[in-house]
Curated annotation (Swiss-Prot):
Enzyme Commission (EC) number: 2.1.1.244
UniProt xrefs under PANTHER family: AD-003 - RELATED (PTHR12753), ALPHA N-TERMINAL PROTEIN METHYLTRANSFERASE 1 (PTHR12753:SF0)
Family: Belongs to the methyltransferase superfamily. NTM1 family.
Gene Ontology CC terms: cytoplasm
Disruption phenotype: Causes significant increase in synaptic transmission including 55% increase in amplitude of evoked postsynaptic currents and 102% increase in the frequency of miniature postsynaptic currents. Decreases total and motionless sleep due to increase in the frequency of active events during sleep-like state.
SUPFAM superfamilies, alphabetized: S-adenosyl-L-methionine-dependent methyltransferases (SSF53335)
Name recorded for this polypeptide: Alpha N-terminal protein methyltransferase 1
Native organism taxonomy: Eukaryota, Metazoa, Ecdysozoa, Nematoda, Chromadorea
Catalytic activities: N-terminal L-alanyl-L-prolyl-L-lysyl-[protein] + 3 S-adenosyl-L-methionine = N-terminal N,N,N-trimethyl-L-alanyl-L-prolyl-L-lysyl-[protein] + 3 S-adenosyl-L-homocysteine + 3 H(+); N-terminal L-seryl-L-prolyl-L-lysyl-[protein] + 3 S-adenosyl-L-methionine = N-terminal N,N,N-trimethyl-L-seryl-L-prolyl-L-lysyl-[protein] + 3 S-adenosyl-L-homocysteine + 3 H(+); N-terminal L-prolyl-L-prolyl-L-lysyl-[protein] + 2 S-adenosyl-L-methionine = N-terminal N,N-dimethyl-L-prolyl-L-prolyl-L-lysyl-[protein] + 2 S-adenosyl-L-homocysteine + 2 H(+)
Family annotation (InterPro entries): MeTrfase_NTM1 (IPR008576), SAM-dependent_MTases_sf (IPR029063)
Pfam families: Methyltransf_PK
The organism of origin for this protein: Caenorhabditis elegans
Length: 234
């Protein structure tokens, strides 16, 4: 989430291993989940709620039955964003200790569904289960090929009319940047748009996060639908 200084290409498995090590060491609280930027929590959740409400008004997904939180950690987004909207929420994270901590952070709530402990590079959401798949501040850990493959698997996880939302930092530099601390890339918007196209996803809505400090790279939200649904870009 922070600034980075490199655009080097890395071996995927090496990056995944080091990223998992980084998050395994993170403090198991909101500050840890936000990389030391706890003050981002309130404006982040507020903007995300507005984005979901906007998607509803545009009829970009039909129901609020089932959502999936990818890179859920202790459940910050699950608890404060998805549970207020959806009847059931599944969680995914590569670090088992963080998923386990969610029992304390959220509590034993009947609206929490399955908890998947697996990296996104191999994770396949259950097919045709979700009205919304939310992917926040985690896509930068995937190399390009794995990101596209993951998006394709997410599309299969959607119910008819379902929607994927990607929320992540976007660099204004000409090339992506690599963060040597958490081992993630901050991609350019053209790179993200190419990944959407390669995944046969249409971008049906997008928004810029507001209220963040200037030293944070811009954060954007993209709503995506499989191309066969017939929606066009907004």
């Amino acid at each position: 989430m922070s600034s980075s200084s490199s655009s080097r290409i890395h071996n995927g498995e090496d990056v995944y291993e080091k990223a998992e090590e980084y998050w395994s060491r993170a403090s198991q609280d909101v500050n840890g989940m936000l990389g030391g930027f706890e003050a981002l929590h309130a404006p982040d959740i507020s903007a995300s709620k507005r984005f979901i409400e906007g998607l509803k008004k545009k009829n970009l997904f039909g129901y609020f039955d089932y959502a999936l939180d990818c890179g859920a950690g202790i459940g910050r987004v699950t608890k404060h964003l998805l549970m207020p909207f959806f009847s059931k929420v599944d969680m995914e994270d590569v670090v088992e200790e963080l998923i386990t901590k969610s029992d304390q952070y959220i509590g034993k709530h009947p609206r929490i569904g399955d908890k998947f402990v697996e990296g996104l590079q191999t994770f396949a959401p259950p097919e045709r289960r979700y009205d919304l798949i939310w992917i926040q501040w985690v896509s930068g850990h995937l190399v390009d090929e794995d990101l596209v493959d993951f998006f394709k698997r997410c599309a299969k996880g959607l119910k008819p009319g379902g929607c994927i939302v990607l929320k992540d930092n976007v660099t204004n530099h000409e090339k992506r940047l690599f963060d040597d601390d958490d081992h993630s890339w901050t991609r350019t918007e053209p790179e993200l748009l190419k990944a959407f196209a390669d995944s046969q996803l249409d971008m049906v809505s997008k928004a810029l996060q507001t209220g963040f400090p200037k030293e944070i790279y811009p954060v954007k939200m993209y709503a995506l639908k499989p191309q066969h649904t017939g929606f066009t870009n907004n």
